[in-house]
C-alpha cells in the first residue's frame, strides 16, 4: 500500500485518492452512515457492506453525549470520553483519518469537525461518500476489522464552538453572521419533522447544507462554494461567522465546505435549534426574511 502523503488530507478526498491507502496501518477509515429517526439504519448498512477496513461510528453513541434536559439532540461528547473512543479505534497523532457516510457528508463532517476540535488535523471526508465509492466500482467488505488500540490525548479548542448564550449575544449583531444549514421549509417554520418547535433564531440566515452538494453528493467546486458563502455572509468575516442546524450535525457540512473553499475560522453553534428551543423564553422567528 502507498505511504501516506507528507501533506495530510484535511478537507476532502476522492474515492480514487483513498483507494491506494486501503489497509494501511496508519490510515483509519470510519463509516458514519446514519439516518435520523432510524438510528439502526447506518449500522445495518455497514454490516451489509462497507469500504474494506472501515470501522463504524454511531452518531448517538460515538459522536455525541447523552441528551440532558438543557441540551440539544446531539450534545458534544466530553473530550476525555471521545479521546477514549478514538484510542479504542486505533488513533494516534500520526494517523490519517477518512470519514464517510452515504452521500451527503453530513454525518462524516460531524466526525471531521469533532476530530479537529480535539486537536487532530489529519482528517478528511470522502467526497460523495459510499455512493461515490461504489459508483467507482471499488470493492466492499462485510468484515469487521480488528485494530490495535492507539493512544490519543484530547486538546479541545474552545474557540471552535459557541454556546447558546454566546449565540444569543451575537445573532443579531451586524458584525456577526449566523447561518442555518436546515432546509428552507424548516428554517421558515413551515414544517418541523424533528423538533417540537418550528422556526429559526432571529438574525439567522438560511444556507441549506444541500446547496453545497451536487446531485451525486459531491461538493461543488471551491470557487462556487466560496461565492455562495460570501453571498450569505454579506461582508462578515469568516471568524465572525457561526453555523447551526437542528442539532449540530449538518452544520458541520457547512464548516467543511467553507474550509474546502479556503474559508477558515467559522464556528459551530453546537447545541443548535434543538437546544435553543429548550428554554421557552428564547425568541423564535418564522418566515424567510
Where are these regions (language model features)?
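Cytosolic catalytic domains that perform sulfur/thiol-centered chemistry
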Residues: 1-289
Amino acid at each position: 500500500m502507498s505511504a501516506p502523503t507528507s501533506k495530510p488530507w484535511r478537507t476532502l478526498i476522492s474515492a480514487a485518492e483513498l483507494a491506494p491507502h486501503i489497509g494501511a496501518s496508519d490510515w483509519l477509515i470510519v463509516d458514519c452512515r446514519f439516518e435520523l429517526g432510524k438510528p439502526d439504519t447506518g449500522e445495518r448498512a455497514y454490516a451489509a457492506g462497507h469500504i474494506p477496513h472501515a470501522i463504524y461510528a454511531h452518531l448517538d453513541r460515538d459522536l455525541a453525549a447523552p441528551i440532558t434536559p438543557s441540551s440539544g439532540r446531539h450534545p458534544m461528547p466530553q473530550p476525555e470520553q471521545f479521546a477514549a473512543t478514538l484510542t479504542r479505534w486505533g488513533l494516534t497523532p500520526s494517523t490519517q483519518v477518512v470519514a464517510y457516510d452515504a452521500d451527503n457528508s453530513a454525518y462524516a463532517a460531524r466526525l471531521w469537525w469533532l476530530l479537529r476540535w480535539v486537536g487532530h488535523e489529519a482528517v478528511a471526508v470522502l467526497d460523495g461518500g459510499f455512493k461515490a465509492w461504489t459508483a467507482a466500482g471499488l470493492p466492499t467488505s462485510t468484515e469487521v476489522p480488528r485494530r490495535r488500540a492507539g493512544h490519543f490525548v484530547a486538546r479541545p479548542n474552545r474557540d471552535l464552538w459557541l454556546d447558546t448564550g454566546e449565540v444569543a449575544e451575537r445573532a443579531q449583531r451586524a458584525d456577526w453572521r449566523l447561518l442555518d444549514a436546515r432546509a428552507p421549509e424548516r428554517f421558515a417554520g413551515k414544517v418541523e419533522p424533528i423538533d417540537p418547535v418550528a422556526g429559526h433564531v432571529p438574525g439567522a440566515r438560511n444556507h441549506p447544507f444541500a446547496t453545497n452538494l451536487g446531485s451525486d453528493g459531491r461538493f461543488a467546486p471551491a470557487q462556487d462554494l466560496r461565492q455562495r458563502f460570501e453571498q450569505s455572509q454579506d461582508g462578515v468575516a469568516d471568524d465572525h461567522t457561526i453555523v447551526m442546524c437542528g442539532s449540530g450535525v449538518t452544520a458541520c457540512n457547512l464548516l467543511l465546505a467553507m474550509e474546502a473553499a479556503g474559508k477558515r475560522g467559522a464556528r459551530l453553534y453546537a447545541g443548535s435549534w434543538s437546544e435553543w428551543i429548550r428554554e421557552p423564553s428564547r425568541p423564535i422567528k418564522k418566515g424567510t426574511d
